[in-house]
Amino acid sequence: TDKTLLVSMMQVNSETGVIQPIEEVGAALAGTKTYFHVDATQGFGKLNDSLRNTKYNMLSITAHKISGPQGIGAFIMRRDRTYRRPPVKPLMYGGQQERGYRPGTTPVALVAGFALPAQLSDKESAVHMESCRAIKRRFLEAVEGLNYTLNGDQEHCLPSTVNISFHGVDAEGIFLVVKEDYAFSNGSACNSGSHA
C-alpha cells in the first residue's frame, strides 16, 4: 500500500535454497515511496547477476558464506538519481566513521579477508554452481527408492542446498549413517542442537 515504508526479503531462503523473486518485487516497488531491502546472505557469490539487475535500496551480505572470515559483512545503501537514500539511523553512536553510521575502527584484516572471496566468487560462481548441481544429482541418485520429499520449489532452488524429509525415518539415525560422506544437519544453524 502507499503506507508501506519498507519491504525486506531474502534473496534465497537459507533452509530450502528457494530463490525469491527479488527482481520482480524490486520492479514492482520502483517508483513508489517504499524502500526495498534485500538480505543476500545466501545468494551473494552465487546469484550476483540477480543482484545487479534488482532495483533495491539496501542490501546485506556476509563474508563467511563465500569462504571469507566470520565477523564481517556489508550493509549497502544505494544513493543515486534513481534511489532515495533510506532514513537509516545508527545502532551505536560514537565517532564519525562510516559517515556516522558505525563508531569504532574498521577491522581492516576482516575487510581484506572479505575482498578476495568476493572477487573470486563473482568470477567462479558458474563453475561452483555446476559442481553443486553434480553433487546434488549424486545425492539424489543415492537416495533413489527411499520415501522422501524435497522441500521447496525445486524449479527455483540453488543447487548448493537440499532440504529433504525422509518419511518414517528418524533424522538422527540418518545422520549417524551418512555423516562421513555428506555435510548436512538435522536442524537449522540457529537451532542449538544443530550440527550445521
Describe each model-derived feature in a short phrase.
Residues 1-196:
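Pyridoxal 5′-phosphate
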